[in-house]
């Protein structure tokens, strides 16, 4: 069985077309992602959605909207970093965190920022979230 195509880069390679020529509609608004949004989609470690042999991504506007709605509708609780490390019995660096604002997967450096700034980690829909460095910088 072939490996599923999960990134825009893999999609462009499998179709043998240049990355910038990939037309990828947003799963939510159906507008095509810009080249910058396609790059961010892969950089944020998001995965393509396949439905009826059609492929969809997620534009930045919809990613932020979905993230906000998820937080408002499905927020469970917040933890201090030592609490979440104790609950999961793993250090924060081994725990997957996504940005609460833009859904980017947090890097090691961003996780260390969460620790050094004494920020809280939120459980939303049984997933752990905190702010990435860009969203923290712009306070959005």
From Swiss-Prot:
What's a single GO BP term from this record?
symbiont-mediated perturbation of host ubiquitin-like protein modification
A Pfam family: E6
The coiled-coil segments of this chain are: none
Instruction: Name the predominant localization.
Output: host cell
- InterPro entries on file: E6, E6_sf
User: What Gene3D superfamilies does the annotation carry?
Assistant: E6 early regulatory protein
Q: GO MF annotations for this entry? A: DNA binding; zinc ion binding
Q: Can you quote a single GO CC term?
A: host cell cytoplasm
The compartments listed are:
Host cytoplasm; Host nucleus
Q: Zinc finger regions (unnamed), where?
A: 26-62, 99-135
Q: Which UniProt keywords apply?
A: Activator, DNA-binding, Early protein, Host cytoplasm, Host nucleus, Host-virus interaction, Inhibition of host innate immune response by virus, Metal-binding, Modulation of host cell apoptosis by virus, Transcription, Transcription regulation, Viral immunoevasion, Zinc, Zinc-finger
What family does this chain come from, according to its entry?
Belongs to the papillomaviridae E6 protein family.
- Subunit structure, as described in the record: Forms homodimers. Interacts with ubiquitin-protein ligase UBE3A/E6-AP; this interaction stimulates UBE3A ubiquitin activity. Interacts with host BAK1.
What job does this protein perform? Answer: Plays a major role in the induction and maintenance of cellular transformation. E6 associates with host UBE3A/E6-AP ubiquitin-protein ligase and modulates its activity. Protects host keratinocytes from apoptosis by mediating the degradation of host BAK1. May also inhibit host immune response.
Query: What protein am I looking at?
Result: Protein E6
Q: Which gene encodes it?
A: E6
